[in-house]
Amino acid sequence: MKKIILLGATGSIGTQTLAIIRENPEKFQVVALSFGRNMERGRAIIKEFKPKMVAVWHTRDRVTLEAEFPNVKFFNGLEGLREVATYLDGDVLLNAVMGSVGLLPTLDAIEAGKAIAIANKETLVTAGHLVMRAAKEKNISLLPVDSEHSAILQALNGENTERIEKIILTASGGSFRDKTREQLSAVTVKEALKHPNWNMGNKLTIDSATMFNKGLEVMEAHWLFGVDYDDIEVVIQRESIIHSMVQFVDGSFIAQLGTPDMRMPIQYALTYPDRLYIPYEKEFRITDFSALHFEKVDYERFPALKLAYNAGKIGGTMPTVLNAANEIAVAGFLNGQVAFYNIEALVENAMNRHTSISNPDLDTILQVDQETRAYVKTLL
């Protein structure tokens, strides 16, 4: 039985992870977890899964829960996340928190010898060189939970990675894939949160609409699979049936197909290289799709993706700036402070004023992250 540490238990990925664990109680046990502000859902999870250690964000929530669950050890804040991530009895850390707050717990878990299932893409975006180096030194498996990177991992099983010609990441195009740039100026938060194919959290859905999410995934793929940015291509695949593919030097392609359901990559990260049965409401039949559609990305229509490629190629602290600026800009949009159209402009502004620092250490990354957030907040 694998003992799971789950960060971000009440979020979209966390909820679907718990569904897998619920279906397979003989294979998995939740021994520690974290959640943010959703106390009602958090209480229900604690009652059902009976973790031994829990981290919440606010001190007041920790105090409240300590009175309700005297047999559980509680922590709060970032230090609480770090405590839970290194819980001695845990085998696997599944990091599903949103944002760069996931970086330090991941590094701590690697240092503690935990296997890592990574859904927090910001960890690799901001500090990929540090994370991959630490994982290599500790001989730690770093398995992707993102559907695209899980697809690449599956396509590369048994393959010689030196024979990769290109990695192709697929994208749905998000909520506004058929709108022009001019039409984006007046879109609302409600409209932006309607993703055509996937059920995701608010931040991720907005990132999908701008395609910053795909840009972060490009950087994540660069670190996970050691492929140059020029050899990572993004294509629009409207149906979200082909989750990504690899092109090899002989001209052949290997792709992973399946229903757009995050339980598939989550279970694969937890059971790799094995697979589990997943009960679906509707069986996936390839014959239900008379055609699958592919389109080139229009980088003028999706400038966020171009910004992400530029940040990745510049390297150093520039990806940290892009990520931090985007997190603040998206929060501003969700709070009604920023027009959707201006999310990319705020990120570009932050990148233009920053001179990248090469091969940054952890303290430098954290400092640049905080400085960027503070700067972008002044622009809201």
Curated annotation (Swiss-Prot):
Catalyzed reactions per annotation: 2-C-methyl-D-erythritol 4-phosphate + NADP(+) = 1-deoxy-D-xylulose 5-phosphate + NADPH + H(+)
GO biological process: isopentenyl diphosphate biosynthetic process, methylerythritol 4-phosphate pathway involved in terpenoid biosynthetic process
MF GO annotations: 1-deoxy-D-xylulose-5-phosphate reductoisomerase activity; manganese ion binding; NADPH binding
Residues binding NADPH, per UniProt: 10-13, 36-38, 120, 122, 201
Keyword annotations of the record: Isoprene biosynthesis, Manganese, Metal-binding, NADP, Oxidoreductase
Residues annotated for 1-deoxy-D-xylulose 5-phosphate binding in this entry: 121, 147-148, 172, 195, 208, 213-214, 217
Enzyme class, spelled out: oxidoreductase
Keyword Oxidoreductase listed: yes
Matches recorded under InterPro entries: DXP_reductoisomerase (IPR003821), DXP_reductoisomerase_C (IPR013644), DXP_reductoisomerase_N (IPR013512), DXPR_C (IPR026877), DXPR_C_sf (IPR036169), NAD(P)-bd_dom_sf (IPR036291)
Keyword Manganese assigned: yes
Pathway: Isoprenoid biosynthesis; isopentenyl diphosphate biosynthesis via DXP pathway; isopentenyl diphosphate from 1-deoxy-D-xylulose 5-phosphate: step 1/6
EC number: 1.1.1.267
Domain of life from the UniProt record: Bacteria
Disulfide bonds: none
Entry binding sites for Mn(2+): 146, 148, 217
Family classification: Belongs to the DXR family.
Job of this protein: Catalyzes the NADPH-dependent rearrangement and reduction of 1-deoxy-D-xylulose-5-phosphate (DXP) to 2-C-methyl-D-erythritol 4-phosphate (MEP).
Name of the protein this chain belongs to: 1-deoxy-D-xylulose 5-phosphate reductoisomerase
Protein species of origin: Listeria monocytogenes serovar 1/2a (strain ATCC BAA-679 / EGD-e)
